[in-house]
Amino acid sequence: VRPGADDAPGSSRTPASLLGWFLAFGVLVGGVLGWAGGRSGAGRGRGAFLVLGSLWSLVSGGAGFLMVYLWAFTDHTYAWRNENLLQASVLGLVLFALMAGWARRGGPAPASVRALAITIAVFSAAGVVMQLLPWFSQVNGAALLLFVPANIGMALGAARAAPATTEPT
């Protein structure tokens, strides 16, 4: 056995960093959502954005609901003041309901989908800004790397699927 062999990358004593994978998956999800939202007027593109956007909203909103539950109804140490609530927002469940209503109704995406997706992305970006402040020291790099690009991609896709209308005055 060589001295220091246990400290080599990949050994059982040194866990491999998964941060790159979280970032890659977040960028992939966000990129696909942004792309699919732009194709929402093109037949299958609408269905792709509805399915993928609804799935992302359900997953992120479900994670947010779980964190709110843990924060409100348990004494779990790590659930209290969990900044990841800005990343996995319970508002995702509301967005899921709006997406389901859009799927049933058909037609162009409602403005409420765009507005709520952008709101969720702004909260997510606010979580990044909070990390720069000395009062917030939670180690949540993995959550930031996954949720921020995915939430921004969802907002971009929703904005492309439901563009703001400019009415003449």
Which sequence ranges carry the predicted segments?
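Long, repeat-rich segments with strong aromatic
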Residues: 24, 51-58
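Soluble extramembrane regions of membrane proteins in the secretory/endomembrane system
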Residues: 1-11
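Selective detector of the "anchor" transmembrane alpha-helix that sits immediately C-terminal
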Residues: 13-42, 90
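Generic detector of multi-pass transmembrane helix bundles and their immediately adjacent loops
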Residues: 38, 43, 55-169
